[in-house]
Amino acid sequence: MTNYFDKIEKVKYEGADSTNPFAYKHYNANEVILGKTMAEHLRLAVCYWHTFCWNGNDMFGVGSLDRSWQKMSDPLAAAKQKADIAFEFLTKLGVPYYCFHDVDIAPEGNSYQEYVRNFNTIVDILEQKQAESGVKLLWGTANCFSNPRYMSGAATNPNPEIFTRAAAQVFNAMNATKRLGGENYVLWGGREGYETLLNTDLRREREQIGRFMQMVVEHKHKIGFSGTLLIEPKPQEPTKHQYDYDVATVYGFLKQFGLEKEIKVNIEANHATLAGHTFQHEIATAAALDILGSIDANRGDPQLGWDTDQFPNSVEENTLAIYEILKAGGLTTGGFNFDAKIRRQSINPYDLFHGHIGAIDVLALSLKRAAKMVEDHTLQNIVDQRYAGWNGELGQQILAGKSSLEALAQAAQNLDPNPVSGQQEYIENLVNGYIYR
């Protein structure tokens, strides 16, 4: 193992009273909550792209971060060093999983053949490092949006040859994900959308991406991949409008192409913000539609119209999110992947640890608070009582299709229904009592 982060041996749990900045205050991996350990509930992962690939650049300035592997003249040698340092970080942080795009781990090269050679070389290395460290792959994916060839989309591109190139990348990334024991495969349509309707055929592009997803499902079954396929919703950026706008939009797409039993969603907090939703809303919607798959844990800034990908730091927001997950039975193959990056001014390499440690503690404390809410059943009792009438004779007849509009119009003549309080203020006080105890 490399010793790039030589000031740290391993991040450990020291409890809430610890003042050690390189220790967990709330994340105790083996602590049992609602019958499962914290590690089993959260299934934490570090993302390769923001953590090991980003150099600190933005739209207004070049990279600000000093990363040795980004200075090497040989791209493949740089990728090998990056893998060494990545697994040092993962091991010292003590997380069980990581995630990657194909071109995060290996250089794309100057041809498809070179891309395949480079990718397979690094997959060999990752397979060995996983075996040595015990760190596993939560999910893999293909980057079909950064290369200029994808400026007009990948699956939705007007050129079928570019569609074909994207399919080839997904083919390789899916095969690698299976080989590495990945538990999910993610599809994020970074440029599957439009800049202007003036040059866009919406029906055609929808049919193209629908067929693309059907081919992905076909390949999953052909190679015997037992993991979960996930689409990651996002409303815009980099395109003006993206076709996977939010969870509800994705569900409508899946239904149209007969994929609702094959694909679930990977929900990112910042993408919910961009779509004008709360993180809790997107999770609750996915759970209600039976497509909740995995989580990209981060936060956005409601005052900014772009993806800031900051580390999550709100116990309130994440308690409500995890409460919805626990009510839905928890995550199965999914987990909490930190799709988050340090700030451009955070130039100390150890800032990577501070960002992840703080975020992990936020999720751990949020899990404790949400679990208590589930355990006490107080909130659920209020909801159950609110809808209790639907368990009665009238409600059951309506839901069972045994009543018509005409029959209900007749029944209404003998009714004098009265509304009851929604108790929102009381419920919000209850929730605050759990969060800030």
UniProtKB/Swiss-Prot annotation:
Free-text comment on the cofactor: Binds 2 magnesium ions per subunit.
Residues bound to Mg(2+) 1 are: E232, E268, D296, D339
| InterPro entries linked to this entry | Xyl_isomerase-like_sf, Xylose_isom_bac, Xylose_isomerase
Listed binding positions for Mg(2+) 2 are: E268, H271, D307, D309
Return the broad EC class.
Answer: isomerase
**GO process terms (BP):** D-xylose metabolic process
What residue stretch is flagged as signal peptide?
none
- The UniProt record lists the EC number as 5.3.1.5
Question: Which family is annotated?
Answer: Belongs to the xylose isomerase family.
- What is the name listed in the Swiss-Prot or TrEMBL entry for this protein? Xylose isomerase
UniProt source species: Mannheimia succiniciproducens (strain KCTC 0769BP / MBEL55E)
Q: What is the lineage of its organism?
A: Bacteria, Pseudomonadati, Pseudomonadota, Gammaproteobacteria, Pasteurellales
Q: What is the name of the gene encoding this protein?
A: xylA
